[in-house]
């Protein structure tokens, strides 16, 4: 006689546990959005107010600690670290965002073509993607940067090259799943032009998948940009990026650890927040069928 109440209790307990997990997940997601938003907003304000333009001004002694003039200390030339931190964060974000936007556009186009048409188009696109995907990401980025020379353009192109393969594969899978649905098949039979099908029927149904992959690509882009600049293949002096600040601070790690720790913390927190936001986007927008196919 106690079987039914026990089963009901277990169902309710499982339901409450699920709701509790969702609340915790939402709280983590909101925290990540707020933290990343603060980083972006403060950086934008610093750029707009010209604070990043004072990076060459000497305000104190070499490798000084925090003070009223230099809130997070000075570097090896006596310059305040705070304006350079803002400049480095802005450079890293701009390079990464531009690269991911370019990669998302190219990957979406290639993935939709391969998934929609199949056949030769699919073979060509996927084989090229497989070749690029076979290389370790940072090694491929270094090769591209070495060929093009260091600087922002080389960093952007390197990130585009390493993020296109995976995004293209995922978009192709999502496109194939949507292209087999009745409303796409009926549109093709009715003679609707392919560009119209792509723009009005395919793209809206895979936009969630694209957003998820773009968010993950952004975290990869920030990490790779930092790695390239740290190794001397990315942004060059007198500009600054988070990776370059870490590389310059390594020489004075024992005397002024904040030169490495603070840019490193900003880099790690940014990547962590973007990954959490990507997980939230995946849970809300990406279909389960696409995840299982992958």
Regions found by a protein language model. Give the residues of each.
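Transmembrane alpha-helical segments of polytopic membrane transport and secretion proteins
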Residues: 1-37, 276-294
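Hydrophobic alpha-helical transmembrane segments of membrane transport/permease proteins
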Residues: 30, 34-77, 232-239
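Transmembrane-helix boundary motif in ABC transporter permease subunits
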Residues: 46-49, 95-130, 142
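Generic hydrophobic transmembrane alpha-helix motif, especially the helices
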Residues: 71, 75, 115-116, 121-177, ...
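Transmembrane alpha-helices
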Residues: 90-106, 141, 195-227, 274
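Glycine-rich helix-loop "coupling/hinge" segments at transmembrane-helix boundaries
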Residues: 133, 144-147, 159, 174-175, ...
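C-terminal transmembrane helix and the adjacent membrane-cytosol boundary/short C-terminal tail
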Residues: 162, 208, 212-216, 257-294
């Amino acid at each position: 006689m106690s079987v039914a109440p026990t089963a009901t209790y277990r169902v309710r307990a499982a339901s409450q546990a699920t709701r509790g997990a969702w609340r915790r997940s939402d709280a983590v997601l909101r925290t990540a959005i707020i933290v990343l938003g603060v980083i972006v907003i403060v950086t934008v304000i610093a750029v707009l107010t010209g604070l990043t333009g004072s990076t060459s001004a000497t305000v104190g002694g070499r490798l000084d600690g925090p003070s009223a003039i230099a809130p997070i200390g000075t570097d090896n030339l006596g310059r305040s670290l705070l304006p350079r931190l803002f400049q480095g964060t802005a450079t890293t974000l701009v390079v990464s965002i531009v690269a991911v936007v370019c990669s998302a556009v190219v990957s979406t186009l290639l993935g939709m073509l391969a998934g929609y048409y199949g056949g030769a188009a699919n073979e060509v696109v996927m084989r090229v993607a497989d070749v690029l995907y076979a290389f370790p990401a940072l090694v491929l980025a270094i090769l591209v940067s070495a060929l093009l020379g260091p600087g922002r353009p080389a960093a952007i192109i390197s990130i585009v090259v390493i993020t296109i393969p995976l995004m293209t594969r995922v978009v192709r899978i999502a496109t194939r799943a949507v292209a087999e649905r009745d409303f796409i098949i009926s549109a093709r039979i009715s003679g609707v032009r392919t560009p119209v099908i792509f723009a009005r029927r395919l793209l809206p149904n895979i936009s969630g998948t694209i957003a998820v992959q773009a968010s993950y690509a952004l975290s990869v882009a920030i990490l790779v940009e930092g790695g390239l600049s740290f190794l001397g293949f990315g942004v060059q002096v007198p500009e600054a990026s988070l990776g370059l600040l870490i590389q310059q601070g390594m020489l004075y790690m024992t005397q002024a650890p904040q030169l490495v720790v603070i840019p490193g913390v900003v880099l790690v927190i940014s990547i962590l927040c973007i990954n959490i936001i990507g997980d939230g986007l995946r849970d809300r927008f990406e279909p389960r069928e696409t995840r299982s196919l992958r």
